[in-house]
């Protein structure tokens, strides 16, 4: 799914509003995913998955950092996320559906925290962006 110029602008503007909260929102999205889709917990058997867990916060920071990097390289997501794609496909062997579940959880989290900025157009642009990220992360499964 190709991001239009308007989509890219919307994604950059929305992620800019996230600002210093990116890690916290990433952790909240993970918590939301674990609660809404309990099967996703199977990939984190060594984590304390309770609310406010340092491990979930730490992984939320990693998710947010990867997304921040992706937002900065919207024209080269495959190159930007290549190492993460390798990691998730070959070492972690994460079921590709989980990227969609995390994307959904992140959209809900952003909608909760940025209600005035989360317009239908921004929602659509972020959804397309996260779908593209998911596609790149699962590209090496084939």
Curated annotation (Swiss-Prot):
It comes from the Eukaryota. One of its GO terms (biological process) is hydrogen peroxide catabolic process. Heme b binds at residue 88. It holds the Pfam family Globin. Keywords: Acetylation, Heme, Iron, Metal-binding, Oxygen transport, Phosphoprotein, Transport. The modification N6-acetyllysine is found at residue 17. O2 binds at residue 59. One of its GO terms (cellular component) is hemoglobin complex. Residues 2-142 form the Globin domain. The modification N6-succinyllysine is found at residues 8, 12, 17, 41. InterPro entries: Globin (IPR000971), Globin-like_sf (IPR009050), Globin/Proto (IPR012292), Hemoglobin_a-typ (IPR002338), Hemoglobin_oxygen_transport (IPR050056), Hemoglobin_pi (IPR002339). GO terms for molecular function: haptoglobin binding; heme binding; iron ion binding; organic acid binding; oxygen binding; oxygen carrier activity; peroxidase activity. The modification Phosphothreonine is found at residues 109, 135, 138. Belongs to the globin family. Involved in oxygen transport from the lung to the various peripheral tissues. Adult sheep and other mammalian species produce unequal amounts of alpha-globin from their non-allelic loci. The alpha-1 sequence is shown. This is Hemoglobin subunit alpha-1/2. The lineage of its organism: Eukaryota, Metazoa, Chordata, Craniata, Vertebrata.
């Amino acid at each position: 799914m190709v991001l239009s110029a308007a989509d890219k602008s919307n994604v950059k503007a929305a992620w800019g509003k996230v600002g210093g909260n990116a890690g916290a929102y990433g952790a909240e999205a993970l918590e939301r995913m674990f609660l809404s889709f309990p099967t996703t917990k199977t990939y984190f058997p060594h984590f304390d998955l309770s609310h406010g867990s340092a491990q979930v916060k730490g992984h939320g920071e990693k998710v947010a950092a990867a997304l921040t990097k992706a937002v900065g390289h919207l024209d080269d997501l495959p190159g930007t996320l290549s190492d993460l794609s390798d990691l998730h496909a070959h070492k972690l062997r994460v079921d590709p559906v989980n990227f969609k579940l995390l994307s959904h959880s992140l959209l809900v989290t952003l909608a909760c925290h940025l209600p005035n900025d989360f317009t239908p157009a921004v929602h659509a642009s972020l959804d397309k962006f996260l779908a593209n990220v998911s596609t790149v992360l699962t590209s090496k499964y084939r």
